[in-house]
């Protein structure tokens, strides 16, 4: 299979995150290899933080797909109402969605940010593969702005003051390298 055909296939989430994509290492594998190598290849458990981050990515990159998220009006995930409505599934809370929608509006209303994200020659969720140290790796750029020769990686954080620690914890440096 040619590199172009592989990249075309990896554009589909079911292939990128599914069996086809598992033949490549990714940045998330680095954390697993560093912290628990025996868990390599295992599906990671969903978390509220990743769910919120995923919703934010979708709101910016593919707003037409926001309906796939289940949203529950509840103060926390520990309430009886949430547990009944979620059916054991991890769902977004309405106040989380409200905050993300406000963040999205602010980003897109900013002339610089909105222009870089919605520019003329821009690609979204662009996958790539590379051989590094004899291993095949995959990565996906959230936004590639060709006019500005810029790659944008959207990130969310609960606390801006702890972002530096989060960047270290989640290996954002290696993600940029890949």
Regions found by a protein language model. Give the residues of each.
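Metal-dependent nuclease catalytic cores that hydrolyze phosphodiester bonds in DNA/RNA
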Residues: 1-138
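Mg2+/Mn2+-dependent nuclease catalytic core
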Residues: 122, 126-178
């Amino acid at each position: 299979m040619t590199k172009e055909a592989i990249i075309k296939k990896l554009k589909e989430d079911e292939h990128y995150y599914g069996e086809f994509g598992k033949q490549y290492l990714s940045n998330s594998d680095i954390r697993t290899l560093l912290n628990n190598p025996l868990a390599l290849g295992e599906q990671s458990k969903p978390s509220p933080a990743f769910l919120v981050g995923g919703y934010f990515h979708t709101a910016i990159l593919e707003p037409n797909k926001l309906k796939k998220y289940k949203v529950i009006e509840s103060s926390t995930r520990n309430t009886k109402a949430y547990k009944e409505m979620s059916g054991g599934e991890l769902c977004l809370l309405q106040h989380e969605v409200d905050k993300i929608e406000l963040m999205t509006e602010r980003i897109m209303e900013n002339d610089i940010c909105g222009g870089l994200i919605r520019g003329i020659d821009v690609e979204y969720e662009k996958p790539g593969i590379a051989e590094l140290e004899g291993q095949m790796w995959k990565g996906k750029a959230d936004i590639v702005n060709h006019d500005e020769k810029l790659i944008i990686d959207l990130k969310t954080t609960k606390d801006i003051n702890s972002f530096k620690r989060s960047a270290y914890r989640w290996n954002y440096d290696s993600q940029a390298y890949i």
